[in-house]
Amino acid sequence: MSRPDESNPLLAEQIAYYRAIAPEYEDHAIPGPGEGELIAAIEAFQPTGDVLELACGPGVWTERLLHHATSVTAVDAAPEMLARAKARVGEDRVRFVQADLFAWTPDRRYDVVFFSSWISHVPLDRFGAFWSFVADCLRPAGRVFFIDDAYRTPDELIEGESSSAIRRRLNDGTAYRAVKVPYRPADLEDRLRRLGWQVTATATSGPCYWGQGMLGRSRGEGGG
């Protein structure tokens, strides 16, 4: 288990938020269509082999990954989320790891790295470092698949539309700050291309998008 990065108060508060929201996580689902499109995209992608799931949360997508994967390593910083994921999945092909993703080093490489509702929570100044980390997690010819959204409500924008810092509340009104970068698919494709990735990002008919691809032969410059 890695220790959270306490040097960044915003990221520490983001972890605290996801620990606190775990019991009511499903109450805060983003409204709108598109879930069927995401499921169809994952089924077409076929995440086979050994899969690393980053920020697994309550295990919603872990179940789906097991339709194809030989094994899944599911990582999350919030023990409360991992407890819910373990109760949901109950599968001996899954290894659960509690770790801060900004401080964790994997002990092996994987055929696929998957993450949902995570890239938007990575600060812009850590974007390039995060994707270097993803590359280090993959075996040669390894693939990546991710799901996210750009959904932010006006009352969350405590520092204005241009800031990636937001405020979210629990059902009892308790407020926490978190990171939420409202990427658009074309923007993500461009940023990743400059880092040497070959990724296609696709919008659904709802608020979400998905991306899939792999690292190119050489990494470019830019990002973040």
Residue ranges and their predicted role:
Residues G128-P140:
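A short glycine-rich, Lys/Arg-flanked "PGG" loop and its adjoining helix->strand segment in the class I
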Residues S117-W118:
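Short catalytic micro-motifs in class I SAM-dependent methyltransferases
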Residues M1-Q46, G49-G57:
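Conserved class I S-adenosyl-L-methionine
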Residues P182-L215:
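Conserved Class I S-adenosyl-L-methionine
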Residues I147-R194:
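C-terminal alpha-helical "lid/dimerization" subdomain adjacent to the S-adenosyl-L-methionine
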Residues G57-A103:
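Class I SAM-dependent methyltransferase SAM/SAH-binding core
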Residues F114:
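A conserved beta-strand element that flanks and buttresses the S-adenosyl-L-methionine
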